[in-house]
Amino acid sequence: MEDKSMFDTIHHIAIIGSDYEKSKHFYVDLLGFEIIRENYRKERDDYKIDLACGEQEIELFIIKDAPARVNYPEALGLRHLAFKVKSVDDTVKKLNAKGIVTEPVRLDDYTGKKMTFFHDPDNLPLEIHE
């Protein structure tokens, strides 16, 4: 089967957070992402933290005065970020044990796989999916 895509894979996803301590604690200490690089950008008065996510990266920008994300009605652009896990049930238990609230586990209508959502400190929806 011929590969028609001009892209190899996703290199990174960029997330904007508003609070350095809360966002770093959430993504590094609670979710377990490894810091690859961390830089304070004086000219912008913000931080950029690059996190390892498998072979991809998450760029976590901390911008104090960034406008709040519009959730309802849904706006154009990125809707949520989904992470593949071996077991949604096991991952939910780990998240809940760390104080992270998750929605009830449900089956994806189209794949039949288990999935659920939770939110980061700035209310970005995050999904786990088998």
Predicted regions and their residues:
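A short, acidic/glycine-rich surface segment
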Residues: 36-38, 44-46, 60, 65-71, ...
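Vicinal oxygen chelate
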Residues: 1-6, 92-130
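Core segments of cupin and vicinal oxygen chelate
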Residues: 16-57
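N-terminal beta-strand motif that seeds the catalytic metal site of vicinal oxygen chelate
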Residues: 1-22, 78-81
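Mid-chain, well-packed structural core segment of small domains
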Residues: 74-89
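Short amphipathic alpha-helices within nucleic acid-binding modules
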Residues: 26, 89-94
